[in-house]
Amino acid sequence: MLFKSTYNEFIKIAAKPRSYLGLVAITVLVGVILFALKADGMSFISFVTASFEQTLSFEGNILNGNLVAFIVLQMLVIHIPLLVALVTGDLVSGEGAMGTIRMLAAKPISRSTLLMSKFLAGAVYTLLIVIWLGIMAVVVGKWMFGPGDLMVLNSDGLVILQDADINWRYVGGFAVAFLALLTVSSLSICLSCFSDNSIGPIVITMAIIILFTIIGTLDVTIFDNIRPYLFTTHMASWRSYFEDPLPVVDIYKSVIILLVHNVVLITVALVKFNKKDITS
């Protein structure tokens, strides 16, 4: 019953034109970035490496597919939550506004199963967004620029990762990025259970992300105790896979915190949805 309901919910997502906005946006944005780097990427690389050229000598294909994919992820991962929230934010409230939620509740399926199918459908859509971003960034990037060692600039200095040691890092990085975006999906669906307006949950989701991001970036002592537990703090944890040595403890911590957020949001949504008056 859950599988069939999830399939039906995903069909509803696929039937909405806005669902393809994310795929189109990723295609266009990544395409523009790839074209710009192909046309004048070495100028950008020279600007970044200018401070190291006096002490280091760079040889080989610096502007390669691995570096291009990393640049794309840096630019786009923080913007993808909006594309996810646009679709998942009205999975409950949208049907409430149209009145179709009453018809669904009349079927021989529990409210909990119905809501979980919406969470699963939202997770599948989020996964497709992440996979498409990976194809455009990594696969197309390597096709256009070729393979090569990855040069990463972080707080500790310059890290150079061998080409043979990179693919598994991208897999792990995208997995953490998916978990972070899944938290956004769970948040928007949870908020959707509290509203009959399709726009409200989407706007509130983005407002929460902006607020938490500001709290996370402000170097104020009062926020030190809560900053590590905000999900936005861990939305960039995919970068940890491109450090050497790999900060395993930090990655585990981020994964656990994101999972806890998802469990809490789903639990709150289930409680609210089971008590929600959908007869009026």
Predicted regions and their residues:
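Aromatic- and glycine-rich beta-strand/loop motifs that create alpha-glucan
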Residues: 1-27
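Secretory targeting signals
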Residues: 27-89, 116-185, 189, 236-258
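Transmembrane helix segments
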Residues: 32-42, 195-230
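Transmembrane helix boundary and interhelical loop/hinge segments in multi-pass membrane proteins
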Residues: 85-105, 278
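Short hydrophobic, aromatic-rich alpha-helical segments embedded in or entering the lipid bilayer
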Residues: 223-243
